[in-house]
Amino acid sequence: MIGLVFFVWYPFQLTTAVGVTHIFLMLLAIDVIIGPVLGLLVYQEGKKSLKFDLTVIILLQLSALFYGIYSIEQGRPVWLVYNVDRFELVRKNEIVDQNINQAKPQFQQASWLKPQFVATEFAKNTQQGNDDMFAEVLGGISIAQRPERYVELNKAKKQMQQREQKLELLQQYNNKTDVEKILAKYPQATAFLPMKANAVDMTVLIDQKANVVKIVDLRPWH
């Protein structure tokens, strides 16, 4: 289960970006610590209700386990969406699927494995652009949450190159030593783009051709 959570559903630095670690630790605490402690508290040899008490504790543990797994699965990042000038991390429970039938087939169903990189399509006319703006301002819904607006990431490479930021800027928002240490691992990285997440914003390193190199645990802004 640990491998599924930290290497498949939440790879790279996405455990920090989404803030799932505390939920997972709480889940482990309930199953590994609280359950056995409750068992010891109710255990009394010869007690008539002992079997019932232990059954209730086991059922509570299983309920907490399944609910925790469900919450982690629903909150996992499924799309890393390039939108205008940044990436946006979209979790499974944040997808707006009311027009999912209008999405391209490859974007109608989120992967059960690692999150996928995609980009958003520009508004086709002024009315659609206004609708997008009002939906985000008034409803808090970004077009990054709408799969019907997704296109392959390579279609946004020209825009990514126009919006890319110099690596030197990262030293304004992070410890200089940390930046140098991380960048030394990825010499092919020539620029970066911000990634907005619900817990901690991250940095996406890209190369000269706007290929994604790595998501790293550096702040892309103040």
Regions found by a protein language model. Name each.
Residues S71-V90:
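Alpha-helical transmembrane signal-anchor/signal-peptide segments
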Residues V37, L41, E45, G68-S71:
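Hydrophobic membrane-targeting alpha-helices
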Residues Q44-F52:
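Membrane-interface helix-boundary motifs at transmembrane edges
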Residues F52-E73:
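Internal/C-terminal transmembrane anchor helices
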